[in-house]
């Protein structure tokens, strides 16, 4: 258990990252630290929060958009019909490195969607993430911190709750973006995770930045190449 405290959570932050998060400076970002390793951002960023009013009859889907040769963005429309009761199978570690095979769109949220490659070998959907950023927790604000896994579980739980209460049309528009400092780095500085639902009774808006960092005595990471981090 554990999570990066503020001084460790900002380790990955550069001027370029701040610009992509639409934050003026590091001190402003620090004000958005949620106390559990990640940052609750003040608004959506490059995200269609009006999708449910603009595209009423949109069907469930999942897609990836690359950033050059790297995994970039995952987008999906989620419902009870897309979620799965387990996580994906396959290799969980970048061999010989500190990194997990992190994903943009997690199997537990889109595992029942046919036509989408959710395997850990899909380079458009897999990025190197630290064990903390990838996450082990299941609830917000615990000793595990607020990692990507925690937000995925939160969304899944809300979809399940809505379904149990016969809200069969409950939908969540979900977007996950790997934020890099520059085009030459292949390890993301963090994950920008955003979600909006068609019923705020079950799920409120989410716009959070999860830094791809370590915590503890040795927090250094070389973001140029995952192979340099053993």
Describe the predicted segments one by one.
Residues 1-53:
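Long, non-catalytic terminal segments
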């Amino acid at each position: 258990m554990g999570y990066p405290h503020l001084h460790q959570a900002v380790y990955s932050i550069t001027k370029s990252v701040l610009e992509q998060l639409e934050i003026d400076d590091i001190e402003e970002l620090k004000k958005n630290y949620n106390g559990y390793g990640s940052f609750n951002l003040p608004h959506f960023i490059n995200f269609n929060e009006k999708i449910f009013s603009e595209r009423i009859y949109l069907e469930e889907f999942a897609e990836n958009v690359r950033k050059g040769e790297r995994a970039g963005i995952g987008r999906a429309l989620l419902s009870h019909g897309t979620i799965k009761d387990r996580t994906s199978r396959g290799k969980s570690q970048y061999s010989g490195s500190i990194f997990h095979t992190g994903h943009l769109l997690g199997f537990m949220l889109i595992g029942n969607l046919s036509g989408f490659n959710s395997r850990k070998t899909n380079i458009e959907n897999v990025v190197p993430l630290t064990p903390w950023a990838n996450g082990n927790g299941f609830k917000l604000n615990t000793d595990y911190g607020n990692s990507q896994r925690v937000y995925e579980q939160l969304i899944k739980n809300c979809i399940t709750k809505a379904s149990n209460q016969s809200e069969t049309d409950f939908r969540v528009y979900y977007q996950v973006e790997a934020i890099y400092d520059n085009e030459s780095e292949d390890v993301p500085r963090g994950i920008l995770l955003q979600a909006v639902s068609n019923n705020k009774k079950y799920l409120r808006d989410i716009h959070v930045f999860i830094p791809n960092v370590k915590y503890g005595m040795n927090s250094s990471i070389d973001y140029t190449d995952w192979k340099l981090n053993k």
